[in-house]
Curated annotation (Swiss-Prot):
Function: Specifically methylates the cytosine at position 1407 (m5C1407) of 16S rRNA.
Family: Belongs to the class I-like SAM-binding methyltransferase superfamily. RsmB/NOP family.
PANTHER family cross-referenced by the UniProt entry: 28S RRNA (CYTOSINE(4447)-C(5))-METHYLTRANSFERASE-RELATED, NOP2 YEAST -RELATED NOL1/NOP2/FMU SUN DOMAIN-CONTAINING
InterPro entries: Methyltr_RsmF_N, MeTrfase_RsmB-F_NOP2_cat, MeTrfase_RsmB-F_NOP2_dom, Nol1_Nop2_Fmu_2, Nop2p, RCMT, rRNA_ssu_MeTfrase_F, RsmB/NOL1/NOP2-like_CS
Keyword Phosphoprotein in annotation: no
Protein's name according to its UniProt entry: Ribosomal RNA small subunit methyltransferase F
SUPFAM superfamilies hit by this protein: S-adenosyl-L-methionine-dependent methyltransferases
Localization terms from the record: Cytoplasm
Keywords noted in UniProt: Cytoplasm, Methyltransferase, RNA-binding, rRNA processing, S-adenosyl-L-methionine, Transferase
GO MF, one annotated term: rRNA (cytosine-C5-)-methyltransferase activity
């Protein structure tokens, strides 16, 4: 694999020599940083099993190498990478996998270690959504996830990835993570804080990642990380699990932040060792039981992961000063709820007791039941999934609901050919040789839902959202 020139400040190299265990080679560290990062994917088990996915892509000749800490994760090599970007494959467009760096699968593996089954989870710094979608898959789309993102521009990307992967149990917020300890004290069974950091571990993906690096900026970032971790720890219920992670390598932003929490809250903090998380995890194990992953150990990005348990309750933080405002939704119950449910079921949209119907004017939504106790305590950017808009003739079913809820074996399901599926993603109407019998059509490809559409004569009218329509080469290789 070709080398690429990485910029290393001298002070950074000095710091790494001091931080790296004597069991590791500094020369191998430099060499690993110069190699481009291996690509990796995570199969979305909400939509397909690992075995079925491997069978589906077997004809493509992709070379997949299992990632030891994630059963559904694989490093991938493809001969046709330049001809067809991985993000333009049919399997990616329909949400069957997520393009995710192998190291970033570690925090969620740690969060669910030791048969942990949390029902209410917060992902405090969630965009672009790789870990939120991984958490949702581990939860089987049950319970609820509060996915927070401070950057307004990244909230839209977060929602797009959640929708593509068919996730229904998530609420989005847009806050500085430092508010949650006061706003939602001891409300969560598990919290992931993948903290903003100096990004020292990503040089294999971005050779210029260290252009603005300085020891002083590391200390400034660590101060913010301590405040975020303090907030997360207050939002965690006693007995709950918190995972703190970064994609950086210095001790100030990693071990020192976790040790500060232990010093501050003493016996309320228990470090949970990660040496048994996967085979050979001990190669990255610190004396405290954390994983400090230098890039040469597993040939991946540099990363840090710590897992801890909250052993006792803490005094509350000062109450937040903001006002949440009136909640604009009302529960949909009785005859109205039954009517919506029956109409949705008739077109192949199904859900269980984990999701409850709510209404705002003519909009019908499904909210995860576990989130309802947080209503009125925090302002949501988006909550659950929009199911439909009501109109005089019935309901206009929403694309995100179809991707999350549709049953591909429903009587109205209509399987497209590969050429027709590509036309669908280009936003074009479909003219099948044998049109479907029903007027309401659940369009599928590879037995995955692509959308709900109307049959007009011999034509299936395209309903794929305009903002998702794709140009350029797609999976048939045609432009």
């Amino acid at each position: 694999m070709a080398q690429h020139a990485v910029y290393f400040p001298d002070a950074f190299l000095t710091q790494m020599r001091e931080a790296m265990p004597s069991t590791l080679s500094f020369d191998e560290f430099i060499s690993a940083c110069q190699r481009p990062l291996r690509r990796s994917i995570r199969i979305n088990t909400l939509k397909i099993s690992v075995a079925d996915f491997l069978a589906l892509i077997a004809p493509y000749g992709w070379s997949l190498t299992p990632i030891p800490w994630c059963h559904e994760g694989f490093w991938i090599e493809r001969d046709d990478e330049e001809a067809l970007p991985l993000g333009s494959t049919a399997e990616h467009l329909s949400g069957l996998f997520y393009i995710q760096e192998a190291s970033s699968m570690l925090p969620v593996a740690a969060l669910f270690a030791d048969d942990n089954h949390p029902q209410r989870v917060m992902d405090m710094a969630a965009a672009p959504g790789s870990k939120t979608t991984q958490i949702a898959a581990r939860m089987g789309n049950r319970g609820t996830i509060l996915a927070n993102e401070f950057s307004a521009s990244r909230v839209k990307v977060l929602h797009a990835n959640i929708s593509r992967c068919g996730i229904a149990n998530t609420a989005l917020t847009h806050f500085d993570g430092r508010v949650f300890g006061a706003a939602l004290p001891e409300m969560f069974d598990a919290i992931l804080l993948d903290a903003p950091c100096s990004g020292e571990g990503v040089v294999r993906k971005d050779p210029d990642a260290l252009k603005n690096w300085s020891p002083e900026s590391n200390l400034d970032i660590a101060a913010t990380q301590r405040e975020l971790l303090d907030s997360a720890f207050h939002a965690l219920r006693p007995g709950g699990t918190l995972v703190y992670s970064t994609c950086t390598l210095n001790r100030q932003e990693n071990e020192a932040v976790c040790l500060w929490l232990k010093e501050t809250y003493a016996d309320a903090v228990e470090f949970l060792p990660l040496g048994d998380l996967f085979p050979d995890a001990d190669r990255a194990l610190t004396p405290e039981g954390f994983l400090h992953v230098f890039p040469q150990i597993y040939d991946c990005e540099g990363f840090f992961v710590a897992r801890l348990r909250k052993m006792s309750s803490l005094p509350a933080m000062p109450a937040p000063g903001y006002k949440v405002g009136a909640f604009p939704f009302t529960p949909l119950k009785g005859r109205e709820a039954l009517h919506v449910t029956q109409a949705a079921n008739a077109v192949g949209l199904l859900w269980d007791e984990n999701l409850h119907l709510w209404q705002r004017e003519k909009e019908v939504w499904l909210f995860p039941a576990e989130i309802e106790s947080l209503i009125g305590k925090v302002r949501f950017s988006r909550l659950g999934i929009k199911l439909a808009e009501s109109h005089n003739k019935g309901y206009r079913w929403q694309h995100e609901a179809t991707i999350a809820l549709a049953c591909p074996t429903h009587a109205h399901a209509f399987e497209l050919s590969v050429q027709e599926a590509e036309e669908w993603y280009r936003g074009r109407d479909i003219y099948p040789q044998t049109p479907p019998a029903a007027d309401d059509v659940l369009v599928t490809f590879q037995h995955q839902p692509l959308g709900l559409a109307k049959r007009i004569g011999a034509r299936i009218k395209n309903s794929y959202p305009r903002e998702l329509v794709r140009d350029g080469k797609l999976f048939t290789g045609n432009s």
